[in-house]
């Protein structure tokens, strides 16, 4: 089915956001793991996989609309050097992605492409949950202090 060129452009922009998120969250996960912060590793790894699933959904929709998924224009990863910087980097990426999603949703609605709109609404719900989690973690860091927060992220290793 031939799709609207502008909706395909929106979907490709969102795909690009997801591709950056996959890599950024995966690297952050492995950095957390290396530091022994297994709870943060597990959460970041899970988020990376979720972003991969979102990317897959965008690719399928773009192909259905007879567009070409753009996997080449990768944005810049913003890799933090400490826990708080990493979470802030992830939050900035999620907030930018949510803004792009809202723009895409509004455009899809205006051209009556309800399937693309519903896809983006579904993904926006996931992104908002991640934003809420990141904001909560940053609030905990501010209230508890980074040392207490970091200590709470350590799980006993199973031998």
Curated annotation (Swiss-Prot):
Keyword Iron in the entry? The reply is yes
Write the Enzyme Commission number(s) for this entry. 1.16.3.1
An annotated GO cellular component: cytosol
- Catalysed reaction per UniProt? 4 Fe(2+) + O2 + 4 H(+) = 4 Fe(3+) + 2 H2O; Fe(2+)(in) = Fe(2+)(out)
Please list the GO biological process terms of this entry.
intracellular iron ion homeostasis; iron ion transport
Pfam families named among the record's database cross-references = Ferritin
* InterPro entries from the UniProt entry: Bacterioferritin, Ferritin-like, Ferritin-like_diiron, Ferritin-like_SF, Ferritin_DPS_dom
- What are the entry keywords? Heme, Iron, Iron storage, Metal-binding, Oxidoreductase
- Which PROSITE patterns does the entry link to? BACTERIOFERRITIN, FERRITIN_LIKE
Which residues are involved in binding Fe cation 1?
18, 51, 54, 127
Q: How is the cofactor bound?
A: Binds 1 heme b (iron(II)-protoporphyrin IX) group per dimer.
Q: Which residues form the Ferritin-like diiron domain?
A: 1-145
Superkingdom per UniProt: Bacteria
Q: Name one GO molecular function term.
A: ferric iron binding
Q: Per the entry, which co-factors are needed?
A: heme b
Residues the entry annotates as binding Fe cation 2: 51, 94, 127, 130
| Record-listed heme b binding positions | 52
* Subunit relationships: Homooligomer of 24 subunits, arranged as 12 dimers, that are packed together to form an approximately spherical molecule with a central cavity, in which large amounts of iron can be deposited.
What family does the Swiss-Prot or TrEMBL record give for this protein? Belongs to the bacterioferritin family.
- Functional note: Iron-storage protein, whose ferroxidase center binds Fe(2+), oxidizes it using dioxygen to Fe(3+), and participates in the subsequent Fe(3+) oxide mineral core formation within the central cavity of the BFR protein shell.
Q: What is this protein called?
A: Bacterioferritin
- Species source reads Serratia marcescens
Taxonomic lineage is:
Bacteria, Pseudomonadati, Pseudomonadota, Gammaproteobacteria, Enterobacterales
The gene from which this protein is expressed is: bfr
